[in-house]
Amino acid sequence: MPTIIDKLSDALHLHSHQSTFDSKVTVIFVLGGPGAGKGTQCARLVEDFSFSHLSAGDLLRAEQHREGSEYGQLIQTCIKEGSIVPMEVTVKLLENAMTATLAERRSGEGWTDGQGRFLIDGFPRKMDQAEKFEHDVGKATAVLFFSTTQEVMLDRLLERGKTSGREDDNVESIKKRFNTYKEQTMPVIEHYEKLGKVIEIDSSVSIEEVHQKTRSAVAKLLSGSTA
């Protein structure tokens, strides 16, 4: 009997292939603990540098509920059976979103002659996801790492929880997310640090201060990558 992984692989045509995008495409992974301010800063960078902002979590949620989706039923089946959505699916959705964005033939800085600029928020969360993305889609140009203390993140998430309505914005869930981040995502950051690709930003300070530091670092990165 074929497993759910087999079914997903068949449906998504998940076969080994060369990376989809070449070095003209800038890919920045955006990582940090829950409440570190990743989404807030991504929104600012979109305005500053015309990035396309992709969230792996948002793509999965949208695909699950999209009418006519070829992946939605399979994602729902994984959830129903209590199994994790395979990394192949997440990577494929990111690849599709990037392909669709490039097909729009955007104008402006960073979007001519086959170029593109992507911020991928909250991904990769594990090393195998990083390896799969780099093999199938393309190499990461850099990793933006928003670092702060667990105390700061907890305070921010509890404050957000007062109005967000998110079930995971409570102390018990937050602590589990912290543990997952430390055990699974920190090794990803350490891996890219060894490659000299990590840009660490202290996100303990105000949103505006973090933005100024981030904008300066990304401007320097882009000027170097396009030189």
From Swiss-Prot:
It holds the Pfam family ADK. Binds 1 Mg(2+) ion per monomer. Its cofactor is Mg(2+). Residues 55-85 are annotated as: NMP. Keywords: ATP-binding, Cytoplasm, Kinase, Nucleotide-binding, Nucleus, Pyrimidine biosynthesis, Transferase. One of its GO terms (molecular function) is (d)CMP kinase activity. It is found in: Cytoplasm; Nucleus. GO terms for biological process: 'de novo' pyrimidine nucleobase biosynthetic process; pyrimidine nucleotide biosynthetic process. Transmembrane segments: none annotated. GO terms for cellular component: cytoplasm; nucleus. Its main location: cytoplasm. Catalyzes the phosphorylation of pyrimidine nucleoside monophosphates at the expense of ATP. Plays an important role in de novo pyrimidine nucleotide biosynthesis. Has preference for UMP and CMP as phosphate acceptors, but can also use AMP and dCMP to a lesser extent. May play a role during the formation of basidiospores in the gill tissue. Consists of three domains, a large central CORE domain and two small peripheral domains, NMPbind and LID, which undergo movements during catalysis. The LID domain closes over the site of phosphoryl transfer upon GTP binding. Assembling and disassembling the active center during each catalytic cycle provides an effective means to prevent GTP hydrolysis. HAMAP family: Adenylate_kinase_Adk, Adenylate_kinase_UMP_CMP_kin. This is UMP-CMP kinase.
